[in-house]
């Protein structure tokens, strides 16, 4: 049987597992400290943990199921990682240098089934969910990279906005959040973590009822059903009306701000008409609504879309501001590398596919 990642256990689950296997409760504190504070890479390095416990952990868990395949570094300090999972699938993770610290964007699924027509992530359909351990390991691999530079840098912020729909992998994502937020471990503050959803309305309600204050972002991208359905297939299942009902519940339950992500597509959703519709849609919650206008990263496979002009983006921004909506134009990261989410993975899979076809042709020619 394949061993699971030790990083998939929350503090509570690790404690319960050790106690169920005859270990004293305080062993969880020791193991947790070695994992997240001292950040060792093998169980054998846990020097104050008894040999019996080390053998128990080694027999049941592994500490790294990700294998680094490609690392791309941008001139602006953005670093993009391509990891291979134990089953051979590929995922992406991105570290971004911000004015407020180091932010990491994690992937939650292998591929994506949401079907946004402008997105590189959806080019490859979802094959499975990531485990909580595989999501945590993305953070740990980046932190180990930082530790190796001896600059005392740490991951301070996390955005769950990589490949996949986080709320379609809800339980594993919640365990991931509890691991990285735990005050005896990485201790990444809940308000420094943002989870983005394309609009799974029932899960937004579930998220409102959780016991932590992690930020929520909504990938909206259009202010009306006709337009949103044309670029986001999920709108057929959860219309803007259903989405706004869930958002209304979330706001009333948490009194927390929501970020609305809006990708700027030339001639599609960037007119004054859409800006006015968006302002009206968010008007009821304008005191807690924050719109993030995102310049589009062109993708080779999506030739129908272009980036909105700077003038149109600024005009859209001005219209929102004049109508009382807080908004910002997102700063771009990694423009000199494969910046679009899913782009690096897609290119790597294509390269592997080409190599395999060449090998097959060569083998056939030799027969």
UniProtKB/Swiss-Prot annotation:
Class of the enzyme per the UniProt entry, highest EC level: transferase
Residue ranges the record marks as coiled coil: none
Entry GO terms, CC: cytoplasm
Catalytic reactions of this protein: adenosine(2503) in 23S rRNA + 2 reduced [2Fe-2S]-[ferredoxin] + 2 S-adenosyl-L-methionine = 2-methyladenosine(2503) in 23S rRNA + 5'-deoxyadenosine + L-methionine + 2 oxidized [2Fe-2S]-[ferredoxin] + S-adenosyl-L-homocysteine; adenosine(37) in tRNA + 2 reduced [2Fe-2S]-[ferredoxin] + 2 S-adenosyl-L-methionine = 2-methyladenosine(37) in tRNA + 5'-deoxyadenosine + L-methionine + 2 oxidized [2Fe-2S]-[ferredoxin] + S-adenosyl-L-homocysteine
Required cofactor(s): [4Fe-4S] cluster
Active site: 92 (proton acceptor), 341 (s-methylcysteine intermediate)
Signal sequence coordinates: none
Cofactor note: Binds 1 [4Fe-4S] cluster. The cluster is coordinated with 3 cysteines and an exchangeable S-adenosyl-L-methionine.
Principal location class: cytoplasm
Known EC number: 2.1.1.192
InterPro entries: Aldolase_TIM, Methyltransferase_A, RlmN_N, RNA_MTrfase_RlmN, rRNA_lsu_MTrfase_RlmN/Cfr, rSAM
Record GO terms (molecular function): 4 iron, 4 sulfur cluster binding; metal ion binding; rRNA (adenine(2503)-C2-)-methyltransferase activity; rRNA binding; tRNA (adenine(37)-C2)-methyltransferase activity; tRNA binding
Pfam families in alphabetical order: Radical_SAM, RlmN_N
Record-annotated Radical SAM core domain positions: 98-326
PROSITE patterns named among the record's database cross-references: RADICAL_SAM (PS51918)
Disulfide bonds: 105-341
A single BP term in Gene Ontology: tRNA methylation
Keyword annotations: 4Fe-4S, Cytoplasm, Disulfide bond, Iron, Iron-sulfur, Metal-binding, Methyltransferase, rRNA processing, S-adenosyl-L-methionine, Transferase, tRNA processing
Compartment list: Cytoplasm
Function: Specifically methylates position 2 of adenine 2503 in 23S rRNA and position 2 of adenine 37 in tRNAs.
Additional observations: Reaction proceeds by a ping-pong mechanism involving intermediate methylation of a conserved cysteine residue.
Family statement: Belongs to the radical SAM superfamily. RlmN family.
NCBIfam families documented for this protein: rRNA_mod_RlmN (TIGR00048)
Protein name: Probable dual-specificity RNA methyltransferase RlmN
Source organism of this protein record: Listeria monocytogenes serotype 4a (strain HCC23)
């Amino acid at each position: 049987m394949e061993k699971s990642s030790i990083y998939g256990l929350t503090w509570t689950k690790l404690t319960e597992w050790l106690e169920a296997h005859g270990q004293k409760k305080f062993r969880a504190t020791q193991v947790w400290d070695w994992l997240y504070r001292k950040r060792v890479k093998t169980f054998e390095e846990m020097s104050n943990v008894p040999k019996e416990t080390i053998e128990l952990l080694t027999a049941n868990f592994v500490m790294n199921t990700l294998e680094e395949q490609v690392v791309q570094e941008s001139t602006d300090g953005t670093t993009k990682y391509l990891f291979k999972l134990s089953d051979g699938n590929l995922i992406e993770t991105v570290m971004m240098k911000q004015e407020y610290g180091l932010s990491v964007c994690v992937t939650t699924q292998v591929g994506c089934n949401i079907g946004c027509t402008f997105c590189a992530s959806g080019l490859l359909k979802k094959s499975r969910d990531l485990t909580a351990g595989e999501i945590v390991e993305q953070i740990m691999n980046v932190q180990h990279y930082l530790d190796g530079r001896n600059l005392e840098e740490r991951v301070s912020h996390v955005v769950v906005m990589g490949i996949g729909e986080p709320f379609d992998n809800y339980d594993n994502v919640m365990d991931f959040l509890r691991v990285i937020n735990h005050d005896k471990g990485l201790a990444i503050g809940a308000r420094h973590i943002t989870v983005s959803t394309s609009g799974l309305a029932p899960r937004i309600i579930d998220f409102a009822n959780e016991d932590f204050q992690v930020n929520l972002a909504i990938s909206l991208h259009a202010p009306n059903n006709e337009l949103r359905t044309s670029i986001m297939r999920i709108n057929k299942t959860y219309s803007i009306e259903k989405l706004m009902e869930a958002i209304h519940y979330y706001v009333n339950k948490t009194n927390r701000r929501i970020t609305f992500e809006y990708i700027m597509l030339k001639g599609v959703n960037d007119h004054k008409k859409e800006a006015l519709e968006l302002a009206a849609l968010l008007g009821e919650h304008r005191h807690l609504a924050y719109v993030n206008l995102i310049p589009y990263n062109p993708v080779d496979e999506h030739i129908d879309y272009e980036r909105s002009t700077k003038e149109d983006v600024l005009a859209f921004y001005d219209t929102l501001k004049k109508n009382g909506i807080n908004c910002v134009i997102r700063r771009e990261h990694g423009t000199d590398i494969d910046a679009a989410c899913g782009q690096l993975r897609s290119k790597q899979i294509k390269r592997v596919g080409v190599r395999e076809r060449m090998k097959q042709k060569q083998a056939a020619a030799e027969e």
